[in-house]
Design a protein with these regions (language model features):
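N-terminal targeting or regulatory segments adjacent to alpha/beta-hydrolase or S9 domains
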Residues: 1-5
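Alpha/beta-hydrolase superfamily serine-hydrolase fold, recognizing
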Residues: 10, 15-261
Length: 261
C-alpha cells in the first residue's frame, strides 16, 4: 500500500501528461506519432486500496502500442479514506472528461484489471442506466466483480491461489471499499447487476485464481443477457498474470488476445 517507487521513465516516443481533476489525478499517454483517434480508459487494480503504480504506466504503453491508442489512466481515490462511491464517481468523471474532450463513446475502450476490471463493468452499467454514450469495448483482466466472495472458486482455489490463497487476511476480504454499503450493490459488485445492452466484452482470468468465478459467472450472465462475450481461462495462471508482460508465454498470448479483440 505504501510502496515508494522510483520515478517512471516515459518512453521517448510518448508524452505522458498529468491531468488534475478536482478530487483525483489522471495521466494521458499520447504517442508522439499520429494516434488512431481512439482512447483506452484504464482503471487500475489494487483492491480499491492502492493508488496507481508504475506497472500500470507500463500497461498504458502496452495498450497504446496495440494500435497507436491514447491511454487515459485514472488515479482514483481509494479506501479506507475514500470508500464507495469515491472510485466509482472518479471513473464516471474521467469518462465524462473524455466525452467533453471530443471523444465519442464508440472511440473509447474501457480496460481494467482486478478491482479496476470490476470498475470497468460497473461504469458500463452506469452509463447504460443513465442513457449515456456507451464505450466501444470492455477489456477485463481478472476482474473483481463479486465483493461478497460468494463464488465457488473462493473455496475451490483457496489452496491454489498463490496471491490470495491460504488466508482470510488478504484485500479481497477486507471490506474497506464497500464500507457501510451493501457489497451486493451492482455498482460495487457488478456480478449482481443487469448485463443487458452492454458493449462487447473480453474476460481474461487464470485457472488458479480465487477470483476465477468472478469472471466465469459474470461472462455467463452477460451471455444470457445477449452480450457479445469472450471469456478465456488461462490454465495454471494467477491473478493478473498479464503483469508479466513478455516474460511468460501465457502473458504474451493474453496481450495478443487483447490486441485481436
Amino acid at each position: 500500500k505504501n510502496l515508494v517507487e522510483p520515478p517512471w521513465h516515459c518512453p521517448d516516443e510518448y508524452l505522458n501528461l498529468p491531468i488534475h481533476m478536482r478530487q483525483f489525478e489522471m495521466e494521458l499517454l499520447t504517442p508522439k506519432a499520429a494516434d488512431n483517434g481512439e482512447v483506452v480508459l484504464q482503471l487500475h487494480g489494487g483492491g480499491y486500496i492502492a493508488k496507481i503504480r508504475n506497472a500500470y504506466r507500463d500497461f498504458a504503453v502496452r495498450y497504446s502500442k496495440i494500435d497507436q491508442y491514447r491511454v487515459l489512466s485514472v488515479d482514483y481515490r481509494v479506501a479506507p479514506q475514500h470508500p464507495y462511491p469515491a472510485a466509482f464517481q472518479d471513473a464516471i468523471e474521467a469518462y465524462r472528461w473524455l466525452l467533453y474532450s471530443g471523444f465519442s463513446g464508440d472511440r473509447i475502450i474501457l480496460a481494467g484489471d482486478s478491482a479496476g476490471g470490476g470498475l470497468v463493468l460497473a461504469l458500463a452499467m452506469y452509463l447504460r442506466d443513465q442513457s449515456m454514450p456507451l464505450p466501444k469495448k470492455l477489456v477485463m483482466m481478472s476482474p473483481w466483480t463479486d465483493l461478497t466472495a460468494s463464488g465457488p472458486s473462493y473455496q475451490e482455489n483457496y489452496e491454489n491461489d498463490p496471491l490470495f490463497g491460504n488466508t482470510r487476511e488478504s484485500m479481497i476480504y477486507n471490506g474497506e471499499y464497500a464500507g457501510k454499503q451493501d457489497p451486493k450493490l451492482p455498482y460495487i459488485s457488478p456480478l449482481f447487476g443487469d448485463f443487458r445492452g452492454l458493449p462487447p466484452m473480453l474476460f481474461q482470468v487464470g485457472s488458479l485464481e480465487m477470483l476465477l468465478s468472478d469472471s466465469v459467472l459474470a461472462a455467463q450472465k452477460a451471455k444470457e443477457a445477449g452480450c457479445d462475450v469472450t471469456l478465456t481461462v488461462y490454465q495454471d495462471m494467477f491473478h493478473v498474470f498479464q503483469l508479466s508482460m513478455d516474460k511468460l508465454a501465457e502473458s504474451r498470448a493474453a496481450w495478443d488476445e487483447v490486441a485481436a479483440f
